[in-house]
Amino acid sequence: MREERPIIALDFPSFEEVKSFLSLFPADERLYVKIGMELYYAEGPDIVRYVKSLGHSVFLDLKLHDIPNTVKSTMAVLSRLGIDMTTVQAAGGVEMLRAAREGLGQGPILIAVTQLTSTSEEQMREDQNIQSTLLASVLHYAKRTAQAKLDGVVCSAHEVKAIKSEVPAGFVCLTPGIRPTGADIGDQKRVMTPHQARAIGSDYIVLGRPITQATDPVKAYHQIKAEWNR
């Protein structure tokens, strides 16, 4: 179920900057955008309602991680915003993941974060005290996520092939850490180009700065979209 539109990360701190950025695109162009913690905590549910009013799809990336009942009730609130996708932390455990699914319902896509693409194996071992390999940790989280009946995971594109060999068909992999050829990788440590991500089986890709900080964001978006779909 590969999504043809790259997801644009709206990594802006304010409503006005989002409005200014989205106004660059033709009114009839339907985008898929990511609203993360900074923007959501600054502007609240109104930013989601505004973006949805323009006809765009919304990936609300809040990475919930709390006791099951709290996650369930929070997801029920988020479901009323009409979001298309959202996230929880796989480390919260199967019970929490199932509670998230119950609270959100069956409409929106619900995916779990495995290991952040900014995390190296050394950091994982030192900071999380997980002494396996990074891939083994990601695969463990992916299998537990599938067991909880979620739709998929957030992972590095480097891990997609291994994940899909371990989970049921239709399990989706959303991959951040995507950069066009020659672009600055920023704080990401495990990156791929859009074309490489497609070839390896990614279903969704997320990009922020290569589009939002481009001299011509609309042109940059369409170039990346063309690379993703070729």
Swiss-Prot record:
The active site is at K63 (proton donor). InterPro entries: Aldolase_TIM, OMPdecase, OMPdecase_AS, OMPdecase_bac, OMPdeCOase_dom, RibuloseP-bd_barrel. Pathway: Pyrimidine metabolism; UMP biosynthesis via de novo pathway; UMP from orotate: step 2/2. The keyword Hydrolase does not apply. One of its GO terms (molecular function) is orotidine-5'-phosphate decarboxylase activity. Substrate binds at residues 11, 34, 61-70, 117, 179, 188, 208-209. Pfam families: OMPdecase (PF00215). GO terms for cellular component: cytosol. The keyword Lyase applies. GO terms for biological process: 'de novo' pyrimidine nucleobase biosynthetic process; 'de novo' UMP biosynthetic process. Its EC number is 4.1.1.23. Gene3D superfamilies: Aldolase class I (3.20.20.70). Keywords: Decarboxylase, Lyase, Pyrimidine biosynthesis. It catalyses: orotidine 5'-phosphate + H(+) = UMP + CO2. HAMAP family: OMPdecase_type1_B (MF_01200_B). PANTHER family: OROTIDINE 5'-PHOSPHATE DECARBOXYLASE. Homodimer. Belongs to the OMP decarboxylase family. Type 1 subfamily. Catalyzes the decarboxylation of orotidine 5'-monophosphate (OMP) to uridine 5'-monophosphate (UMP). This is Orotidine 5'-phosphate decarboxylase. It comes from Streptococcus equi subsp. zooepidemicus (strain MGCS10565).
